[in-house]
């Protein structure tokens, strides 16, 4: 198609712009070099600079038609011309001789892609910026009816069918609607070969209302979604793409900006736009306007266009996620395409920016993100699509999509600040609650899904947090300890079994060991009991994991070494005691160095008592004698890492009831080996013992250092009575509910923490190491019902246990008489009553329910919470009164 200058210029909005030829429809190319101008808003937006009218030239017979007689030209093409014309060959044949005329030169210029389906032959011309527009190509044999629209498919360029494609409006020029589907507003009538109009009028249901008034091009268009009128189809297309999110065309790149019409901003939407936007979801398949959504999937499945050439069109009202077009996450080829098409990139980035940040839009993404670690849905089309298509159509699933997995992002370019992660990344997709750490979100999500991954190996109990499983395991330890026998020193070894410190069967020990190994994993994060403490405990745990040195006493190595050293135990006896004995030997070697560094080896009292202890242990070899009298001194001196006497009841399961002497300057190697031999020989009499967690090594050193300071202050302190041992204390308890905590510093343990009920008749009492159970007293009289039967938590007094038990039962016996407040502690009720008024202070009463409050801000909160609707009604009445 070519255009020539003629006598009188005519506005392009009065005539059609497109000449269809066989299987290719070319857009009209403007003649003048100075570009395009918009003279009036009622026009289509294009203005020809030349003074002559345009002509339509048939590519086969070279017959010229005035642009106003485009219908005659269409009939001419339908009845006489079939097959490809020379003008079409000039576009596709790169080896053809250069065109001789200026119009032919413009016609041969490569088209730019506008988001439509193309043939494989035209694929070479799509990605380079050009100066023309290549509209959609379709061929339908015979006239098209509305009922046939959903089943339409394009025909290849080599098809022998006679060309019947007709474009009668700018919507067809941009490939939005099927080319042979006429608009009712265009008044398309069948034209005979001589140029006379036919009798019938071709009509189709389309949401376009126009004023014909004898014009070929309608003067107004009305959007079916928001009922907004437009003066030209070009403005309507812009409105549909930029406002409603339809993906219709691509904006040209910077190389073609000189030929791009300067467009005005579309009129604003009406107030009913948002409410009517979901209308398109209910349009039938036969509605032509619905083809804006159906065109992509229809053409994509046709075999004539290859596989994966153009991904499917996204849903109508789903804007592309912003992070898909983040420059930091694009590959090199996609970044090059963004550089070539910045306007299209910016347009996609502008689509509905507020909808992206809405939490309601995040459910499907979060679910796909969670499921992406295990399974990935197959992509829509096989193979890797065109980079520009993947850039501008990020809705198609692909292995690189952030929707499907959460791999670490590639390193950011130097000097570029990384994009801030959205706040919703750690928000619950079920209730919207936000969390500072991912592990807290994982634990919280289980409350919605009902997942309970932590299961007890001894019963049917299952829970969602490792900490709850730990408390549950204490109940099993407590029960297992009550079945143990008596020890050789005459005291019951399990009469006061502490949770986690009593003798355990092999399977219970294995379960506890597995749990501890799981709990010590820093990648799991904290699992707090209350939601309010989740973030704080997470931060503390992270800091602890970062600052904690690597310990040689890992759980796996301890178990492995224990099994190797305990291989000589007969099958009828549990081997846990032998494993713990070998472990204690290694700990003695490692921690003995710590005690020497602390200065205890230089004290004469330390050396004398140690020598007497080793002498008696080597001479008698009696397990009972080892745990009596002065034998307790070395254990007491050693603190948390020395030779532990069998009577060390605050943590009897952490070390075996045999001496594990420490090396000192005055003691040689033979004595140490003798003690080891005695320990191994007496392992048959030892009950199973638990293992020390690796995180307690540092605390052991602290206690040893504090012990050295204490001995230097009072070097003549004797430890024949374990009841006066500075280490035999379990006074660590929190200020909230009296539950035992390991928060007391070592200095307090030494100076003021003496407890007469925390030791036993045997020496060597040592503080609890923070193992599976708190440091409870081990004597018979110390055994009280201060252990929670629900979670195994231990309390110093029964009143705290009573209050704690209500957190499990939900009981709230203390109720306020003025409101519906109820609590589990009387102190909380007393504190609450102060909010209703205090003696000698002014009282503020609610005007509606007459409830008293001592603080006015509390009254305001009460009004908003309980009388919000009433206040809103009063505000409306006050505003109406003020206006009147």
UniProtKB/Swiss-Prot annotation:
- Residues annotated as region Disordered? 370-427, 470-575, 727-784
Enter cross-link residues for Glycyl lysine isopeptide (Lys-Gly) (interchain with G-Cter in SUMO2): 136, 587, 676, 713, 877
According to the UniProt record, list the residues that bear Asymmetric dimethylarginine. 322
* Impact when changing residue 849 to S: In gamma induced thymic lymphomas
Q: What is the effect of changing residue 676 to T?
A: In gamma induced thymic lymphomas
Picking any one GO biological process from the record gives: thymocyte apoptotic process
Q: Which residues carry this modification: Omega-N-methylarginine?
A: 293
Q: What is this protein called?
A: B-cell lymphoma/leukemia 11B
Species for this entry:
Mus musculus
Classification of source organism: Eukaryota, Metazoa, Chordata, Craniata, Vertebrata
Name of the gene this protein is made from: Bcl11b
């Amino acid at each position: 198609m070519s255009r020539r200058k003629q006598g009188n210029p005519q506005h392009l909005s009065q005539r059609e712009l497109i000449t269809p030829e066989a299987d290719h429809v070319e857009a009209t190319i403007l003649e003048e070099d100075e570009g395009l101008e918009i003279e009036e808003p009622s026009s289509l937006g294009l203005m020809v600079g030349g003074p002559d009218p345009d002509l339509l030239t048939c590519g086969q017979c070279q017959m010229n038609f005035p642009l106003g007689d485009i219908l005659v030209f269409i009939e001419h093409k339908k009845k006489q011309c079939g097959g490809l014309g020379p003008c079409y060959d000039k576009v596709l044949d790169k080896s053809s001789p250069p065109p001789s005329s200026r119009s032919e030169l413009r016609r041969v210029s490569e088209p730019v892609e506008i988001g439509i389906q193309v043939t494989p032959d035209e694929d070479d011309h799509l990605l380079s910026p050009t100066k023309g527009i290549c509209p959609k190509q379709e061929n339908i044999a015979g006239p098209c009816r509305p009922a046939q629209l959903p089943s339409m498919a394009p025909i290849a360029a080599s098809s022998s069918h006679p060309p019947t494609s007709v474009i009668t409006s700018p919507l067809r020029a941009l490939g939005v609607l099927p080319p042979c589907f006429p608009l009712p507003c265009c008044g398309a009538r069948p034209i005979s070969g001589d140029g006379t109009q036919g009798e019938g009028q071709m009509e189709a249901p389309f949401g376009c209302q126009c004023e014909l008034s004898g014009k070929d091009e309608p003067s107004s268009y009305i959007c079916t979604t928001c009922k907004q009128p437009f003066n030209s189809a070009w403005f309507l297309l812009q409105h549909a793409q930029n406002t409603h999110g339809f993906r219709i065309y691509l904006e040209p790149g910077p190389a073609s900006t000189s030929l791009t019409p300067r467009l005005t901003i579309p009129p604003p939407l009406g107030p009913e736009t948002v409410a009517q936007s979901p209308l398109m979801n209910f349009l039938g398949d036969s509605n032509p306007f619905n083809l804006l959504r159906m065109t992509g999937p229809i053409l994509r499945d046709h075999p004539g266009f290859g596989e994966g050439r153009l991904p499917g069109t996204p849903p109508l009202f789903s804007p592309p996620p912003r992070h898909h077009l983040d420059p930091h996450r694009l590959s090199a080829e996609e970044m090059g395409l963004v550089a070539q098409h910045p306007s299209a990139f910016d347009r996609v980035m502008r689509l509905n920016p507020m909808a992206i940040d809405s939490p309601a839009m995040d459910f499907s993404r979060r679910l796909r993100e969670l499921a992406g670690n295990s399974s990935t849905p197959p992509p829509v089309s096989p193979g890797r699509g065109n980079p520009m298509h993947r850039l501008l159509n990020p809705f198609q699933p692909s292995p690189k999509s952030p929707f499907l997995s959460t791999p670490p992002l590639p390193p950011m370019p130097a000097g570029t600040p990384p994009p801030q992660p959205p706040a919703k990344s750690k928000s619950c997709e079920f209730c919207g609650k936000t969390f500072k750490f991912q592990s807290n979100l994982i634990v919280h999500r289980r409350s919605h899904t009902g997942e309970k991954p932590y299961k007890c190996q001894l019963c049917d109990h299952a829970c969602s947090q490792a900490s709850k499983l730990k408390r549950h395991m204490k109940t099993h330890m407590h029960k297992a300890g009550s079945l143990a026998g008596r020890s050789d020193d005459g005291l019951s070894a399990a009469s006061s079994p502490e949770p986690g410190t009593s003798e355990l069967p092999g399977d219970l020990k294995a379960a506890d060991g597995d749990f501890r190994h799981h709990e010590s994993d820093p990648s799991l994060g904290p699992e707090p009991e209350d939601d309010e403490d989740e973030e704080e405990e997470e931060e503390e745990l992270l800091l602890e994991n970062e600052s904690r040195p690597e310990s040689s006493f890992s759980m796996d190595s301890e178990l492995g070494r224990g099994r190797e050293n305990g291989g000589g135990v007969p099958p009828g006896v549990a081997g846990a005691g032998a494993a713990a004995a070998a472990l204690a030997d290694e700990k003695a070697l490692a921690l003995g160095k710590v005690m020497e560094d602390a200065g205890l080896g230089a004290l004469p009292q330390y050396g004398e008592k140690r020598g007497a202890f080793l002498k008696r242990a080597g001479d008698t070899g009696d397990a009972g004698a080892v745990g009596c009298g002065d034998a307790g001194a070395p254990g007491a001196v050693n603190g948390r890492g020395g030779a532990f006497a069998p009577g060390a009841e605050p943590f009897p399961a952490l070390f075996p009831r045999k001496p594990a002497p420490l090396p000192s300057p005055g003691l040689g190697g033979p004595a140490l080996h003798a003690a080891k031999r005695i320990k191994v020989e007496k392992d048959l009499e030892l009950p199973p013992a638990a293992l020390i967690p690796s995180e307690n090594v540092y605390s052991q050193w602290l206690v040893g250092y504090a012990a050295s300071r204490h001995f230097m202050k009072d070097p003549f302190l004797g430890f024949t009575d374990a009841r006066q041992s500075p280490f035999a204390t379990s006074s660590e308890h929190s200020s909230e509910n009296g539950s035992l905590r390991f928060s007391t510093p070592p200095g307090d343990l030494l100076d003021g923490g003496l407890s007469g009920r925390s030791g036993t008749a045997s020496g060597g009492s040592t503080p609890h190491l923070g193992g599976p159970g708190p440091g409870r007293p081990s004597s018979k009289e110390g055994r009280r019902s201060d252990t929670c039967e629900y979670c195994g938590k231990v309390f110093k007094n029964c009143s705290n246990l009573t209050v704690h038990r209500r957190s499990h039962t939900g009981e709230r016996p203390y109720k306020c008489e003025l409101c519906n407040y109820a609590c589990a502690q009387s102190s909380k009720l007393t504190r609450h009553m102060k909010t209703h008024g205090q003696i000698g202070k002014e009282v503020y009463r609610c005007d509606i329910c007459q409830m008293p409050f001592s603080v006015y801000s509390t009254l305001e909160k009460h009004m908003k919470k309980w009388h919000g609707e009433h206040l809103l009604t009063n505000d409306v009445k006050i505003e109406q009164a003020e206006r009147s």
